[in-house]
Amino acid sequence: MHGKYTTLKDIVLDLSPDPVGLHCNEQLDSSEEDEVDEQATQATQATFTQHYQIVTCCGQCDSNVRLVVDCTGSDIQHLHKLLLGSLNIVCPLCAPQT
């Protein structure tokens, strides 16, 4: 560059793109990585508890029932499966009737 201002004549674009192979010849055993990741996730979930608010329907009168539970992520998933299955929660008004 000569002078105070840049002109198009001063810019030289002589670079061309180089093709680069993106394939790698390294072999990884994915089953070992999955096991390590799964164990780390389970260990983290086992020690970390959290409050979960649950709103469901009474098994007798279909009114809304609110629950707050303190459990781990895997426990709340298990509770979710139970609520979708045969487990029914009953409201305080219907509880004496059962």
UniProtKB/Swiss-Prot annotation:
Q: Which gene encodes it?
A: E7
Q: Where are the zinc fingers (unnamed)?
A: 58-94
Tell me the segments the record calls region E7 terminal domain: 1-41
Where, by residue number, is the motif LXCXE motif? 22-26
Family to which the UniProt record says this protein belongs:
Belongs to the papillomaviridae E7 protein family.
Q: Which UniProt keywords apply?
A: Activator, DNA-binding, Early protein, G1/S host cell cycle checkpoint dysregulation by virus, Host cytoplasm, Host nucleus, Host-virus interaction, Inhibition of host innate immune response by virus, Inhibition of host interferon signaling pathway by virus, Interferon antiviral system evasion, Metal-binding, Modulation of host cell cycle by virus, Oncogene, Transcription, Transcription regulation, Viral immunoevasion, Zinc, Zinc-finger
According to the UniProt entry, the note on domains is:
The E7 terminal domain is an intrinsically disordered domain, whose flexibility and conformational transitions confer target adaptability to the oncoprotein. It allows adaptation to a variety of protein targets and exposes the PEST degradation sequence that regulates its turnover in the cell.
Question: What organism does the record attribute this protein to?
Answer: Pygmy chimpanzee papillomavirus type 1
What is this protein identified as? Protein E7
Protein origin, superkingdom: Viruses
An example GO biological process term is: symbiont-mediated suppression of host type I interferon-mediated signaling pathway
A single GO molecular-function term is: DNA binding
**Motif Nuclear export signal: positions:** 76-84
- Functional summary from the UniProt entry: Plays a role in viral genome replication by driving entry of quiescent cells into the cell cycle. Stimulation of progression from G1 to S phase allows the virus to efficiently use the cellular DNA replicating machinery to achieve viral genome replication. E7 protein has both transforming and trans-activating activities. Induces the disassembly of the E2F1 transcription factor from RB1, with subsequent transcriptional activation of E2F1-regulated S-phase genes. Interferes with host histone deacetylation mediated by HDAC1 and HDAC2, leading to transcription activation.
Protein's cellular compartments: Host cytoplasm; Host nucleus
**A matching Pfam family:** E7
Keyword ATP-binding set for record: no
Q: How is it modified after translation?
A: Highly phosphorylated.
Quaternary structure, per UniProt, is:
Homodimer. Homooligomer. Interacts with host RB1; this interaction induces dissociation of RB1-E2F1 complex thereby disrupting RB1 activity. Interacts with host EP300; this interaction represses EP300 transcriptional activity. Interacts with protein E2; this interaction inhibits E7 oncogenic activity. Interacts with host TMEM173/STING; this interaction impairs the ability of TMEM173/STING to sense cytosolic DNA and promote the production of type I interferon (IFN-alpha and IFN-beta).
Cellular component annotations (GO), alphabetically ordered: host cell cytoplasm; host cell nucleus
